[in-house]
Amino acid sequence: MSYVIDRRLNGKNKSTVNRQRFLQRYRGHIKKAVEEAVGRRSITDMEHGEQISIPGRDIDEPVLHHGRGGRQTIVHPGNKEFVAGERIPRPQGGGGGQGAGQASNSGEGMDDFVFQITQEEFLDFMFEDLELPNLVKRHLTGTDTFKTVRAGIANEGNPSRINIVRTLRSAHARRIALSGSSRAQLRALKAELERLRLEEPHNFGDIKAAEEEIERLKARINRVPFLDTFDLKYNLLVKHPNPSSKAVMFCLMDVSGSMTQSTKDIAKRFFILLYLFLKRNYDKIDVVFIRHHTSAKEVDEEEFFYSRETGGTIVSSALKMMQEIMAERYPANEWNIYAAQASDGDNWNDDSPLCRDILINQIMPFVQYFTYVEITPREHQALWYEYNQVAEAFSDAFAQQQLVSAADIYPVFRELFQRRMTS
């Protein structure tokens, strides 16, 4: 009996490596399709991946072949029409094959290649090259600290960490698997030899044949090594980093009466995308939700996205609450502080200069990055022009963008959180 042992470390997902190589090769096509999908469907609709279509011409492999034209000597087996030395006129048309008619100078020769990417792969491409700007370590004495913890068994490792019990158990199982049938035959032959010696002591031929077969089986069993490199098992120790870069994101959303339902929906979709990005890319991050109209209120995630409360507009109330929470819970020497604000720009006239002063004097000196998105198809409001002064004073830590429609959310989001090149 033959045995096939699959020693591949990726046995259950045999095509994973090839799939990753394929995704890397056609990264441009996939990123374009993901960007189109984000603009087409709801931000909350992330329970599935996306169908990707790649034109057939882009998946062709380069090959070497004879060019058209020239003189060729070809042997056609079973040819009954021509004899050696006859000249055959060149076929008309520029296309290959045996189709009738002239070759066409347009059209495609292959169907598009369509495949499905998973939700995990979809989100990977969606948030590729994005990060929180200016993230630094806070409250540290030096380098990162790590904690070594047990993480199971590995097939490779340091000889000093070999797990003897698991190694011998694996070796024993392998020897049983490889020599099981031979051992069964050996037991049967020994019983047969014992019977021959008792019942047929003069049957020297069968006794000798049984003894030779027993020796052959013993030699076959002995050829199975006691220990194989595949049997070696090691205690796996991994280093878990202790959190050293603590970050908090303040989400400030205007829910005043001037915000139409469409404008509120765009603001919510922007914050849903931001929240999804933070939770996927950062393990240790706090998110503070603040809704405001004439007064500000810290709320939980559910109320932030689904509450229907509304009122007048005093933007400074949200900034004041953010500053109070920063002072109370998030000291700047220990935390990386970020903020994202969404509004339609309408504000009580005397309040916009106050917002500028609060930002410049009480918030911006202590935050890593502050983003403001104004959701309006009209001209910018007074708040935008006051924030221009903040952008001039803190050009590296303050950014503002305009959203006109839901289609602008993803491009603006990528622009705000694009990974920056560091020298």
Swiss-Prot record:
SUPFAM superfamilies documented for this protein = vWA-like
Q: Where is this region: Disordered?
A: 84-109
Pfam families referenced in this protein's UniProt entry, alphabetically: DUF444
Regarding protein family, the annotation reads: Belongs to the UPF0229 family.
| HAMAP family (alphabetical) | UPF0229 (MF_01232)
> What protein name is recorded for this chain?
UPF0229 protein PST_0721
Q: What is the lineage of its organism?
A: Bacteria, Pseudomonadati, Pseudomonadota, Gammaproteobacteria, Pseudomonadales
